[in-house]
Structures are given as C-alpha cells and as structure tokens.
Amino acid sequence: RHPSEIDASWGAQRVKGLSIVAILKDVFGKIFKKKNRKVETSLIEEFKYPKLGPGQLWDVTAAEVEKLGGTIIKNAKVTKVHKNANNMLTSLTYEKDGQEFTMEGDYFISSMPVRDLVGGMNDVPADAARIAAGLPYRDYMTLGVLVPKINLVNKTNIRTVNNIVPDCWVYVQDRNVKLGRFQIYNNWSPYMIKDLEHTVWIGLEYFVNEGDEYWNMTEEEFAKIGVSEMIKLGLIDSPDVVLDVHMEKVKKAYPAYFDTYDEMDKLVAYLSSIENLYCVGRNGQHRYNNIDHSMVTSFETVKNILTGSRDKKNIWSVNTEQEYHETSNNEGNEA
C-alpha cells in the first residue's frame, strides 16, 4: 500500500508535539545545556527500561496477579464472546490444548484485535461488523543476529561499552533493502547480553504481511536475507562473522490506518454501548499507541470500573490530543 493512502490521524499521533520550532528549541537547549527544558516525546533521549527487557515487566505483573488470587490462563485463544439480549457480555469461549472452555464474567477488558473481538461476537449490527472486518493490520518479523562487532563508529560524546554506537534503534531508509529498522540490544540493557565485552546482538526488523513470501520463510532462509542486507548496509563485512541467529514472528503487530479505519468512530460508539466491555491497548483500540499509552488505557479502565463510571471517553481519548501542528498560545502562536 502507498503511504499516501494512510489516514492522516496516524501521522498526527506519531509526531504529536513535533515541529521545526520544537526541534530548534531542543537543539539550542542542548547547546546551552538548558536545565529542565521540556522535551517532545519524539525527541526524548533517555527513558526507563526493564533490566531484562519489556517481558520482565509482564512477568512481574503476572506474579502480582497470581499473588492476589488471580488466575492467568496461558497459551489459549479466545474464539467467541457471548452477548445477551440486554447488550451485556456474559461469557467467552476459548480454546486450549485442542479443547473448548467457557468462562463467565462481570467485566470484560479486551486487548485482542478489534477485528477478532467483533468477529467472534453474536448479534452485532451489520454496519459495525462490516467496519471491524475491514480493519487491516501489518505483521512483523525480526531476526536476532549475534556478531563480534558492528562497523558503525561511535562519533558522539556518549560513552558505550567497546565504543559501539549509542543508538537503541536505527530506521533504515535505503530502498535497496527490505529491512525497515534495526535494534542494538546491547544499548537497551547490558544485562540482556551474555558476553557484553565481545559480542553485539542486533535485531533486524521487517514489516510484512501474514502469508507473504517473507512470512513463509524458514529461519535459515530469513537469516540469509537478513545477513546479506547487513553486509549491504556495511554493518558487517561477511556472513562468516555471524555467531548465531534467531527468528520471531508477530501477527497483527501494527494496526493499519487504511480501508474501513476512517469509519472507526462508528465502531467505537457501538463497542462503548456494551456496558461491561472495555477495549484497551494498541490492538484493542486499533490505534498505533506505544506501550506507555497502551498501559494508560488500562489504568483508565480500572478507574472507571472502581468508580462505576459508564462513560468510556476517557479510555478511548488516551493519546488523541491534536498538538502536532501548533505550539501553545503562550509561545506566540507559532506553527
């Protein structure tokens, strides 16, 4: 799909608060070492990161849930959501180990893809069902590549182990490769690297569609392409230096802003009318939120349940402020 087809709200969300003025302020703020300067999200250079990666956060969360008496059913797939005549959810059906199970509930908090949620629900109005069925997604593949070093030189004042470049991730604009971005896991957290002094873990990221030629590749086939593109980009000199590889695939990693997305407001209105259903997270709201905002949608949901609030606008409006074209009035109405 051509980028010109993407709904404008996607760009608004991803560069919110960012402008030429904001970039210049940030540059001069660094030069003059201005303290307590406000930094736009897109320009943030430091952030907190779990010692062993994002998964560690959810491991701790899961342990707390179980400590408080909650039950977590893993490796299961929700296939149906049951609604009664009063437009209230009553139960769901899930599959695990080849068997079907039913679970009843008072509140249903869903982070599953909206398309799947509505597709598995009974008695959905035709228009809402059509919109949900038409929502597109982009899938994701990554190849971890372990090498002794990379050729990128650290030209900054930021100190790193073995003086590797300090970036956590780098976007690739070269049309000669399929690679969209790569990560340097050493810089995310040194605790994730077994031999920090002598190796570098690189994560090659590819944006694909489930079932396409890349998605159907074996790890060996995918590794051959990934390593060859690292050589093209000058990250390494030869496939012989590769010590190890590992492939992962993620379905529906990115909710896409094409097709029926421009009718999303109608679908949100329908989902909000189901009193005990709360849609959260990136796929739950079909919104390209980062992990921070995804968690906030859950915080807002819990707040509503505890206070008995039936208005879900606060949940659906997380990270929707339109600040990307303008600066505030007290900054001279610059744009």
What name fits each language-model region?
Residues P50, K74-I236, Y270, K313-E323, ...:
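Mid-domain catalytic core of redox enzymes
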Residues Y206-E210, K249, G281-G284:
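Short, histidine-centered active-site or binding-site loop motifs used for metal coordination
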Residues F258-A335:
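C-terminal lid/capping helical subdomain adjacent to the catalytic/cofactor pocket in oxidative enzymes
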Residues T71-I73, L243-H246, Y278:
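General small-molecule cofactor/ligand-binding pocket signal
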Residues R1-V81, E104:
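Active-site/ligand-binding neighborhood in enzyme catalytic cores
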Residues K224-S272, E323:
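Flavin (FAD/FMN) cofactor-binding core of flavoprotein oxidoreductases
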